[in-house]
Amino acid sequence: NFRYDQWREISKELADDFVFEERFCLSILPTATQYARNAIFSGLMPMQISQMYPDLWVDEDEEEGKNLNEDYLIKTQIDRYRRKDTFSYFKLNNSVESEKVVDRIGNLMGNDLNVLVVNFIDMLSHARTESRMVRELANDEKAYRSITASWFRNSPVRELFRELARRDVKVVVT
C-alpha cells in the first residue's frame, strides 16, 4: 500500500542523506499486500508460490495471516539461486520494534541482505477505511500524504535511514 505520492513525500526527507535512482516497475494484480509482498520476497508469482511451497501459502479464504512466512519466502529465493547470502528479516509494526533495529544496526551490517518491512503505511491505509477518526484526519489525498510525511519525520524509521546513510549502504524502497 505504499503509494508513489507517499514516496515523493518521504523522499523529500531523505534527499540530504541519499542519492536516488528511481526505477519504475509493473506490479502484479491484485496489488494486495498478501500477494505483492510474498511475490517480491519469493521471486515468484502467487500461483507459483502455492504450487512450489504449499506449506508457505495461505489461501484467501483461510483465517490465518497471509504474510506470516515472508522470511521463509526470502530464504526459498536465495536457495533457488544457490546463493550463500546471509540475511535478516524484521517486520516493524511499532516504534519500539523500529528502535530495536536501530540499536542493532551494527550487528546487521555483517549480513549480505537485511529486509525490513515497515508496516505503518499498510496499517494507515487499513485504518483509513476502518477508523472514523483516521478518515477525518486523512479526509483527502493531501492530508493523507501529510500524515505519512509527519509520521516519517517523527518516527524511529527516520533515524534508521539516517544511520543507513552514515554507513553508506544501498537501500531499496518499495
Task: Give the residues covered by each predicted segment.
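Composition- and surface-driven signal marking solvent-exposed, interaction-prone regions
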Residues: 7-13, 129-131, 174
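His/Asp/Glu-rich, glycine-adjacent segments
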Residues: 29-139
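Alpha-helix capping and helix-loop boundary segments enriched in small/acidic/polar residues
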Residues: 24-31, 61, 65, 144-151
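Short alpha-helical segments and helix-capping/turn motifs at coil-helix boundaries
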Residues: 9, 23-26, 97-103, 156-158
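Active-site-proximal structural scaffolding
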Residues: 3-7, 33, 67, 98, ...
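Beta-strand elements within well-structured catalytic alpha/beta cores of enzymes
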Residues: 1-7, 40, 113-118, 157-164, ...
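Segments forming glycine/polar-rich beta-alpha architectures that bind adenosine-containing cofactors
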Residues: 1-30, 35
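A long, amphipathic alpha-helix that forms part
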Residues: 133-171
